[in-house]
Amino acid sequence: MFPLNSPRSEITTVADPIYLEIFKNLYQFIAEEMGITLQNTAASVNIKERLDFSCAIFDEVGNLIANAPHIPVHLGSMADSVKSLIQDKGETIRPGNVYLANNPYNGGTHLPDVTVISPIFDRQNQEILFYLASRGHQADIGGITPGSMPPHSVHISEEGILFDNFLLVAAGQFREQELINHLTNSPFPARNIAQNIADFQAQIAANAKGERELHNMVDRYGLAMVKAYQQFVQDNAELAVRKAISVLKDGEFTYYLDNGAVIKVRITIDIDNCQATIDFTGTSDQLNNNFNAPLAVTRAAVLYVFRTLVEEAIPLNAGCFKPLHLIIPSGCFLNPVYPAAVVAGNVETSQAIVNALYGALGIQAASQGTMNNFTFGNQKYQYYETICGGSGAGANFAGTAAVQTQMTNSRLTDPEVLEMRYPVLVESFSIRPDSGGKGQYSGGDGVIRRIKFQESMTANILSGNREIPPFGLAGGKAGKIGRNAVERNDGTIEELPGTATVEVNPGDIFIIETPGGGGYGNC
């Protein structure tokens, strides 16, 4: 795993390019190993099959060092959760402790995304060297609807159980009864506690794998060298982002959501210092629905966009954010205050932010702009998926059909697994022809997904771009809007809005047609 000879005593203030590459890849490798462990040991379809999880490594003050290429909206926001833990628990953090966090106002995204955070001490248990975090989307964490993705929540308590740096493991002892009490003592308790516990234990195992690998790295290279190169890795990422910024131009964009909310963004480039200011002044106030995006989500979307402009193979880390200055007014729906509902802000508004930023930079037409969040369940079953669509076109490239875009990178569950674990049939799943916007370079097509139910359940859809189409750029046409409907077992069609909850019966078919991406350039 490690080179046999390492210059433990040759630590300088200048990075050796060979060792810089070694450490960049080594940190990412450790995060990927954490992810493999999590996938192999998790119980839920959501984590094991859909891969809706992320793993990352942080330094002793909570700065992101490296991550595996998992879910962008997780990766850009987890540092805020780690820093919240450090600020909250501080001197009480002890060897063998592990914490749970999902508070959207302390670095969380939405309540189903629960982060397990482990402090990593040196082998003498004297000093914290790192923090490890694994974030997984729980198939159900309580709330007013099965699957914990309620389309019509207006208060954070309606979306599930909140963990605010909850002590999950104390000095190596798993606090199972305290966890069960926390999951059940709520107006809207969790529905599948055994699965929650199993997935949390899988996340603990993932962090333990990362701990072993980090200790091996320190043993091999020495702490001084490891510390030096974790900073070099961040410095290298910062330089790469500054280089990408140096060729950009000022821009602004106004982006409209189906619910009437508006994102206004102005990007100002400081060429002399290779910095960018991203100003969301003028954006709509906090909403009385759940499309409010926590500050950590907005930051993650900005970080994602600027990371995608970098051509070099760098890990996403704290260095990427140093050249970026954000202005996000408190109380707007991109920086809401408690107790705003946020479940769609993470999955839907994050997509809108990315589209708005690309629009301001003039780089890419809108992608589908939604994750098409589909949940169904009852007291026995709970399932959640995000459904792919079309990506936007840009100068010199066409969009891609049937792909997860921007802030999500999750899989769809294999039909065989889905049908084995749940009383449903995947009746069809196909590309939606001609849904991408036309242009010199056309946007990618969306998809059509039809799920047939064999048992009565509650089904929910939380989606966007059902009224306003994904925009084209430079003369390109907009992509097609999405569509939601239920085909009842008697053949009647019930059209649904972008956010809806319906009761489905055996033989009913839920139909989701996802948006296409916008085109770029005149035909």
Where are these regions (language model features)?
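Glycine/proline-enriched, intrinsically flexible loops and inter-domain linkers
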Residues: 2-95, 100-123, 128-277, 281-523
